[in-house]
Amino acid sequence: MRLLILLSLFAMNVLSAAEEKIVIWKMDDVRAGEKKRLAQGFKRLAEWAKAEKTVVTMGVICDSLAQPNADDVAWIKANAVENGGEVEFWHHGWDHRSWTDAAGKQQWEFRGPDVATQAKHLRDAQAIFRQTTGLTFRVFGAPFNQADDATIAAMDTVPEITIWMYPPKKETKRKVIGRTLNIEVATGKVSYAKFAQEYAAKKPTSMMLLQGHCGMWNDDSFRDFAKIAALLKQDGWITLTAAQYAEKIGKK
């Protein structure tokens, strides 16, 4: 009987771990340069995270650091999880460009260019972030969430990055975190009503990676974001950074 009880408890613990509800807040487009300063929305979200005793992740566009703003860089350092803050900063490319080539084909920073070009952007961004902040990216998310097979090959040149958000389907070398529900109905516009509708319909029970552009949010969008976060907290969702989540699933 005792053995049966122990086995039952073990099964319950395994089930609990498998069904644990985890949310990752993926915020895009941090800039911290003299030409393109840090948007106030990132500071507001970090302050919210501190008040809520939780964490968020923010992607840095690194060409802005070619001419860094001292105050913005100091803010990154002070708020980084490595320094006791609430923000995981991740690699969001060098220049976040998209364009149409001479043949009329759409190109993105990490979809279209060859391996060498993409590798240079990855390495340059990694190097300048380390140089200006003393921190190292462990997580990558491509601009526009556009990446290709060349990106997969180029990523081998930045071995410090072990986690990829929204990768191509063929990616197998790094831990991957895929897209789930949406909190924005358009870039920079959060809708609690739309999210709540989708959330109720799909009834997610495992990890959710939720993308936003908080640097563009107005007061209404921020309030709707806070309502979404409150809803998930009430429903038992735990907030982690991408690295914390990868570590957690790696132990199972």
Segments from the language model and where they lie:
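Boundary/entry segment of secreted carbohydrate-active catalytic domains
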Residues: 18-44
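Active-site beta-loop-alpha junctions enriched in small/polar residues
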Residues: 28-30, 61-63, 94-96, 145, ...
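Active-site-adjacent pocket scaffolds in enzyme catalytic domains
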Residues: 22, 69, 75, 139-142, ...
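Catalytic domains of carbohydrate-active enzymes, especially glycoside hydrolases
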Residues: 41-57
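C-terminal domain-boundary segment and adjacent tail
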Residues: 162-166, 214-252
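Generic structural signal for well-ordered alpha-helices
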Residues: 42-46, 73-77, 119-126, 152, ...
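Metal-dependent polysaccharide deacetylase catalytic core of the NodB/CE4 family, i.e.
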Residues: 55-149, 206-210
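Sec-dependent N-terminal signal peptides
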Residues: 3-12
